[in-house]
Amino acid sequence: MRAVLLPGSGEQPAAFCYQVNGSCPRTVHPLAIRVLIYLACAVGMLITVLGNLFVVFAVSYFKVLHTPTNFLLLSLALADMLLGLLVLPLSTVRSVESCWFFGDFLCRLHTYLDTLFCLTSIFHLCFISIDRHCAICDPLLYPSKFTVRIALRYIAAGWGIPAAYTAFFLYTDVVERALSQWLEEMPCVGSCQLLFNKFWGWLNFPAFFIPCLIMISLYLKIFVVATRQAQQIRTLSQSLSGAVKRERKAAKTLGIAVGIYLVCWLPFTVDTLVDSLLNFVTPPLVFDIFIWFAYFNSACNPIIYVFSYRWFRKALKLLLSREILSPRTQTADLFHD
């Protein structure tokens, strides 16, 4: 396929994705810009995959981390890691080349995995908010109310519901037959936008905001209770005081993770709703920026843990040293020096 850049122009639709009628126009970027974007995306994918892989390994390996909250963190990290491993490479090519070159089967599979991992993330953050709410607001009953078995049920729901939900829309024709007037065919050959239509724009909005409202309301209550506990903490014994402080620290850290998630995903979610009302007028470049800003969230959580959790930093130090080969390392106490 020939692509020609006009002299003095940075980029322009100078070619088509395929040499067929109805092909999508292809925006050709200068080689230097393409290489720069590929390198930036590669670094982002590396941080996403390795950072979340370490979370998965640390929680799995160190027995002291086998708690309900950490199992939820492990499952969340697994979703983010798989996003970086299976979704982002093809998304990078699509964004840089402005075309989908991988066929209809991979288009549908890529869309399925993309939606699955993103919905799984928000479900897990919602469940983690419930866990922190129980730990802070009802600390005496928390160990019996939120057990490992309960956490595993939440994890199963966090994966199962998004998997069934996304498969229903992508691999059945029920919605297509019932709401054909709302749905549009693929705008052109070489595009992979199966779920970007008016119906999905309206459906995506509550799927994002209902869990977000739940998380915000829970963390507001956590903040009120934690403030009250801070005034009472001096009267507690030293051991109980330390336990309460650890729970509050975890709630604060995970609250930051939820806040960053909202900031990263809000532009994309609002745009999908508004764009469906305005007949999809968002420029492709702006839409790609919103998508990648949302993807960026998957790399954030391990970075948050590094700066917030002593156990995470200690586990990282052990992983990068020879001590990881010692059988005693698996039972190491990561919470004390």
UniProtKB/Swiss-Prot annotation:
Gene3D superfamilies: Rhodopsin 7-helix transmembrane proteins. Glycans are attached at residue 21. Coiled coil: none annotated. GO terms for cellular component: plasma membrane. It is found in: Cell membrane. Keywords: Cell membrane, Disulfide bond, G-protein coupled receptor, Glycoprotein, Membrane, Receptor, Transducer, Transmembrane, Transmembrane helix. One of its GO terms (biological process) is G protein-coupled receptor signaling pathway. Residues 176-189 are annotated as: Extracellular Loop 2 (ECL2). It is a multi-pass membrane protein. SMART domains: 7TM_GPCR_Srsx. Residues 1-38, 92-109, 176-204, 275-284 are extracellular. GO terms for molecular function: trace-amine receptor activity; trimethylamine receptor activity. Residues 60-70, 131-154, 226-253, 308-337 are cytoplasmic. InterPro entries: GPCR_2-like_7TM, GPCR_Rhodpsn, GPCR_Rhodpsn_7TM, TAAR, TAAR_fam. The chain crosses the membrane at residues 39-59, 71-91, 110-130, 155-175, 205-225, 254-274, 285-307. Disulfide bonds join 24-188, 99-192. Olfactory receptor specific for trimethylamine, a trace amine enriched in the urine of male rats, playing a role in social behavior. Also activated by N-methylpiperidine. Trimethylamine is present at high concentration in the urine of male after puberty and acts as an attractant. Trimethylamine-binding causes a conformation change that triggers signaling via G(s)-class of G alpha proteins (GNAL or GNAS). Also required to provide olfactory input into limbic brain areas to regulate emotional behaviors likely via modulation of the serotonin system. In addition to the well known disulfide bond common to G-protein coupled receptor 1 family, trace amine-associated receptors (TAARs) contain an unique disulfide bond (Cys-24-Cys-188) connecting the N-terminus to the extracellular Loop 2 (ECL2), which is required for agonist-induced receptor activation. PANTHER family: HISTAMINE RECEPTOR-RELATED G-PROTEIN COUPLED RECEPTOR, TRACE AMINE-ASSOCIATED RECEPTOR 5. Belongs to the G-protein coupled receptor 1 family. This is Trace amine-associated receptor 5. The gene is Taar5.
